[in-house]
């Protein structure tokens, strides 16, 4: 833990609060939802407390104490927490829907713990409630939907609502493919069953549309997609439709309107939607894209939080002993048993999913150059005089030298940006089509592209004394990168602790102005893309001259150069006046930002999808608060000296992730542990000291009705609980009968299947039900003689299942 926050002054009172923005990617299935709910609860607690929002509705005195401790700790650290992007998959989709709705409406998660405690139970009154439309799955998904919708209806809007973006994933069943072609023109089919639904609450953003005086920027309308309880409930229910456990759901017309993936045109036929975790476990890309569009006003820092309730990837293959280097007589050693091989074969795909997620994040961070761009920009602008009356910079100051170098390499930059434009236009057009290319860009045929003028390609680098442009010749993507560099330069030093937040006091209006101009540029870019898609719909060819002509026409028809120049020049003026106190030096500010742009693009293609600057934090099952760390470390070794599976700390990881639904005490434990994991991770992110963390640990445990010694003992109990002990406990608590009743109901169900089951298989399911279903729950019996004769088998079977029978 750190002792404080570098933004604070010597007396411990920060001059300006650092906004710590969290983007959450929530991933987990079935009863792991309970742990994730605990994490969401604690994140919401610190969000509310640090922003001066009162404790959640109906908070107990113990919960109010937690709220007060969070408020004091974050105030001392000089930080407030914002959650502005949430992506949820499976059970993460459910919790993400509830958390995002609470944030957007200014409501609270007051009922979330009760929802999981009461509704997440495998009983005939809850998840195994009889299904009205026939037995379509083991559990009653309609019951689950009704509980979620009911919780959403309780979230009454208040003045504390905040802007937030929500992405929920699902998997489409049935046909979902398009015809694509390879580089030789041969066609084949590309399937994509991933579905993403986007909900957002944000203020009015600019739009670029045609009016009486041609295309102009206009103020858009505020957006709030998080008011429709039913559509939100269906999105959460669809994302968590674990195969066979819950029936898939139909994509409603309103839900279809929120679909943003696939990004190519699909049929208008609605889909059947199943669990998002089947194909799209961790949707990082839409989260990063959403981050790009978030406006800022104060100093900020961004953390991408991966909330995933599992560490089982590390345990995979642990039961296989490595070979000892050859057996006796140079014979190969005994291979692993087939059971271990089978377990590895089924388990290793989990490793692949998790590894791909981490590799993707690593590449994103590695390829990001935003911090370096800002450093170069600051180096060039630090020597700009602070008063407009001062003389121009000396001949070889950094900015003058940069102008000279950029002028020399501009031909290389022009080639790069032309190639990038051709690639991007082709990709934009092809991705919008229901058919396309697996390699839509092919090779650029002319490495030079001649010297013809184009409205999106610069002819010269701005010289000293040049005014701000009235027509922007650098393209929309470069405009975004240039203004984004200016915006990032207003906060990155305080966020990294290199400068106190007090040095950034008064920059709020500047950040707001630059954020607005980025939205203007995004609106113009969207209009350009829409023009290109329309123009390219019937294009027989997408060779270089045709693509360049399309782009020229788009800029001319839309007046994009003039509109972009207004936004970029306005950004440079705002930065020069607001940050440098030298409004007349706006052309030099723009030249400095363009120098960064040219130096990046002269040797490679400019990046058309800039990545935000962010830290990465994984919210997982390990790393509890310090007061619980020793007990956790000790429990990692079992009584016989063998290592325990770290996943055992949660009951929700047992019985194929269903166990927490079987026992209310287990759900309460998982919820509490989620709060503990969130506290430990948030404490490190926000710079809390040890005393603050210890006080919060004890306060949260008190709010959960638990004492510290009991929790320390509970860690040992959970980690050493064997599968047999879990099954014995569930049997003694009569948890198996409703599950078996549901299984037999499904086996004898007459619900249609696709493809239709063979008659022999259906009859076998009916026979198993007739043979073993308990009295009173046997449904329609077809094999009466078999059932009567099987009493001698059925009675001891149920005696074992129900010890008190």
Language-model features, listed with the residues they occupy:
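Flexible, membrane-associating and regulatory peripheral segments of lipid-active enzymes
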Residues: 1-24, 45, 84, 591
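Patatin-like phospholipase
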Residues: 18, 23, 32-156, 172, ...
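Extended hydrophobic secondary-structure segments that form protein cores and membrane-embedded regions
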Residues: 22-26, 83-90, 118-122, 164-171, ...
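Surface cap/lid and interfacial helix-loop subdomains adjacent to catalytic sites
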Residues: 107-165, 177-185, 193, 202-203, ...
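Active-site gating loop/helix substructures
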Residues: 165-296, 447-541, 548, 552, ...
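Charged, amphipathic alpha-helical linkers/stalks
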Residues: 302-307, 313-446, 690
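Acidic, Ser/Thr-rich low-complexity intrinsically disordered segments
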Residues: 318-321, 335, 349, 355, ...
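Long, C-terminal catalytic modules of enzymes
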Residues: 377-395, 654-686
């Amino acid at each position: 833990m750190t002792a404080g926050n570098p933004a604070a002054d010597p007396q411990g009172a920060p001059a300006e609060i650092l906004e710590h923005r969290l983007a959450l990617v929530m991933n987990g299935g079935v009863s792991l939802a309970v742990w994730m709910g605990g994490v969401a609860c604690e994140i919401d607690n610190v969000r509310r407390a640090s922003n001066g929002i009162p404790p959640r509705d109906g908070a107990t005195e113990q919960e109010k104490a937690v709220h007060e401790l969070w408020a004091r700790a974050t105030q001392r650290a000089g930080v407030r927490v914002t959650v502005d992007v949430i992506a949820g998959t499976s059970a993460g989709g459910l919790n993400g829907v509830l958390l995002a709705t609470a944030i957007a409406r200014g409501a609270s998660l007051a009922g979330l713990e009760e929802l999981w405690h009461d509704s997440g139970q495998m009983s005939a009154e809850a998840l195994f409630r009889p299904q009205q439309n026939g037995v379509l799955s083991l559990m009653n998904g309609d019951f689950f939907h009704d509980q979620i919708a009911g919780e959403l209806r309780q979230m009454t809007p208040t003045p504390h609502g905040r802007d937030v973006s929500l992405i929920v994933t699902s998997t489409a069943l049935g046909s979902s493919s398009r015809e694509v072609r390879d580089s030789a023109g041969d066609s084949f089919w590309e399937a994509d069953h991933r579905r993403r639904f986007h909900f957002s609450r944000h203020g009015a953003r600019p739009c670029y549309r045609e009016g009486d005086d041609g295309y102009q920027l206009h103020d858009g309308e505020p957006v709030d997609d998080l008011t429709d309880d039913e559509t939100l409930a269906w999105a959460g229910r669809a994302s968590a439709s674990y195969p066979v456990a819950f029936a898939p759901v139909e994509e409603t017309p309103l839900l279809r309107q929120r679909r943003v993936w696939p990004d190519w045109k699909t049929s208008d036929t609605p889909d059947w939607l199943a669990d998002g975790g089947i194909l799209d476990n961790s949707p990082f890309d839409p989260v990063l894209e959403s981050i790009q569009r978030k406006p800022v006003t104060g100093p900020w820092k961004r953390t991408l939080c991966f909330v995933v309730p599992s560490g089982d990837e590390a345990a995979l293959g642990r039961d296989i002993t490595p070979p000892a280097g050859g057996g006796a007589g140079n014979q190969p050693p005994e291979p692993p048993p087939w059971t271990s091989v089978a377990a590895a074969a089924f388990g290793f795909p989990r490793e692949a999913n998790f590894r791909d997620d981490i590799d993707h994040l690593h590449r994103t961070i590695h390829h990001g150059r935003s911090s370096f761009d800002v450093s170069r920009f600051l180096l060039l602008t630090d020597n700009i005089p602070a008063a407009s009356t001062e003389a121009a910079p000396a001949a070889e100051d950094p900015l003058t030298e940069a102008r000279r170098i950029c002028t020399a390499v501009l031909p290389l930059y022009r080639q790069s940006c032309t190639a990038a434009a051709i690639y991007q236009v082709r990709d934009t057009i092809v991705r919008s089509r229901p058919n396309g290319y697996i390699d839509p860009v092919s090779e650029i045929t002319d490495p030079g592209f001649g010297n013809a003028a184009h409205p999106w390609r610069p002819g010269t680098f701005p010289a000293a004394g040049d005014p701000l442009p009235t027509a922007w010749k650098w393209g929309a993507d470069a405009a975004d990168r240039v203004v984004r560099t200016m915006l990032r330069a207003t906060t990155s030093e305080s966020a990294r602790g290199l400068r106190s937040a007090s040095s950034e006091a008064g920059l709020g209006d500047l950040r707001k102005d630059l954020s607005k101009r980025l939205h203007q540029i995004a609106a113009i870019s969207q209009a350009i893309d829409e023009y290109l898609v329309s123009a390219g719909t019937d294009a027989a060819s997408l060779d270089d001259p045709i693509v360049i002509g399309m782009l020229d026409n788009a800029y001319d028809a839309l007046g994009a150069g003039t509109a972009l120049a207004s936004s970029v020049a306005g950004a440079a003026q705002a930065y020069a006046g607001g940050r440098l106190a030298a409004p007349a030096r706006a052309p030099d500010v723009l030249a400095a930002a363009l120098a960064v742009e040219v130096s990046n693009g002269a040797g490679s293609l400019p990046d058309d999808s800039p990545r935000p600057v962010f830290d990465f934090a994984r919210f997982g099952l390990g790393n509890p608060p310090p007061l619980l760390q020793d007990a956790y470390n000790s429990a990692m070794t079992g009584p016989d000296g063998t290592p325990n599976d770290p996943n055992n700390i949660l009951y929700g990881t047992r019985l194929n992730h269903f166990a927490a639904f079987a026992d209310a005490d287990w759900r309460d434990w998982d919820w509490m542990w989620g709060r503990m994991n969130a506290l430990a991770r948030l404490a490190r992110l926000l710079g809390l000291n040890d005393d603050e963390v210890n006080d919060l640990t004890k306060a949260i445990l008190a709010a959960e009705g638990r004492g510290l010694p009991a929790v320390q003992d509970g860690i040992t109990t959970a980690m050493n609980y064997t599968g047999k002990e879990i099954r014995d406990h569930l049997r003694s608590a009569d948890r198996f009968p409703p599950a078996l009743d549901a299984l037999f109901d499904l086996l004898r169900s007459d619900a249609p299947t696709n493809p239709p089951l063979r008659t022999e298989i259906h009859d076998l399911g009916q026979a198993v039900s007739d043979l073993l279903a308990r009295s009173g729950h046997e449904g329609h019996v077809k094999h009466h003689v078999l059932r009567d004769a099987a009493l001698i088998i059925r009675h001891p079977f149920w005696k074992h299942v129900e010890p008190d029978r």
